[in-house]
Amino acid sequence: MATNAKPVYKRILLKLSGEALQGSEGFGIDASILDRMAQEIKELVELGIQVGVVIGGGNLFRGAGLAKAGMNRVVGDHMGMLATVMNGLAMRDALHRAYVNARLMSAIPLNGVCDNYSWAEAISLLRNNRVVILSAGTGNPFFTTDSAACLRGIEIEADVVLKATKVDGVFTADPAKDPSATMYEQLTYGEVLDKELKVMDLAAFTLARDHKLPIRVFNMNKPGALRRVVMGEKEGTLITE
């Protein structure tokens, strides 16, 4: 199989959904999936790629149901941020067990648990080939973890945001509901907006577009997909200018 000898990206921002960590379980963290993801991230580090990671929290907390019951949105979002910290702690531990140097940073201060987010420190760690896990979203309510991924991706000057999902890429329709749906290999930001394709929420997507930050959507459940993406092979959907 012909592959590039060297990775096409030097620094990436990997966005993992919380749901990806729960595996076939309906809730929580599947240890085997966590360890597999840690091994795939380790492969990237061994290729010399600098890796920032943003993880969602949907496997541990879902605010929608409580919001319907009357919970304040700000409170729900704060709980969601803490869920991402819990996932970050689990990922840091899995990386350490895989002998990968990793640092967990939080956008909200949690002294004694993890470091406070510092842009300068994050850049320094990445340059020294440390995996940096960026948790607690943006630190503000009303912003999704996709927004956090794009914001941090821009801040750390990542070459791309790699959005790991449960499907192979961006499709013409929901492949779970429409068997005739086909996958796009490449799209422009404008095409995504015109076709109203579900890539990420509008705030996150326009942030990436305005800063010309490429997004690649791929299936994290497919073994080796992450490596294929960084080696420039055909995998997932690329969204650029």
From Swiss-Prot:
Pathway field: Pyrimidine metabolism; CTP biosynthesis via de novo pathway; UDP from UMP (UMPK route): step 1/1
Residue numbers binding ATP: 15-18, 58, 62, 165, 171, 174
GO MF: ATP binding; UMP kinase activity
SUPFAM superfamilies documented for this protein: Carbamate kinase-like (SSF53633)
Catalyzed reactions per annotation: UMP + ATP = UDP + ADP
Keyword Mitochondrion set for record: no
GO cellular component: cytosol
A Pfam entry, by short name: AA_kinase
Record-listed E.C. numbers: 2.7.4.22
Keyword tags: Allosteric enzyme, ATP-binding, Cytoplasm, Kinase, Nucleotide-binding, Pyrimidine biosynthesis, Transferase
Segments of this protein annotated with the region Involved in allosteric activation by GTP: 23-28
Cross-referenced InterPro entries: AceGlu_kinase-like_sf, Asp/Glu/Uridylate_kinase, Uridylate_kinase, Uridylate_kinase_bac
Location relative to the cell: Cytoplasm
Regulation: Allosterically activated by GTP. Inhibited by UTP.
Binding site for UMP: 57, 77, 138-145
CDD domains named among the record's database cross-references: AAK_UMPK-PyrH-Ec
GO biological process terms held by the UniProt record: 'de novo' CTP biosynthetic process; UDP biosynthetic process
Disulfide-bond pairs as recorded: none
PANTHER family: URIDYLATE KINASE, URIDYLATE KINASE PUMPKIN, CHLOROPLASTIC
Subunit structure: Homohexamer.
Family: Belongs to the UMP kinase family.
Function recorded in the entry: Catalyzes the reversible phosphorylation of UMP to UDP.
Listed name of the protein: Uridylate kinase
Originating species: Citrobacter koseri (strain ATCC BAA-895 / CDC 4225-83 / SGSC4696)
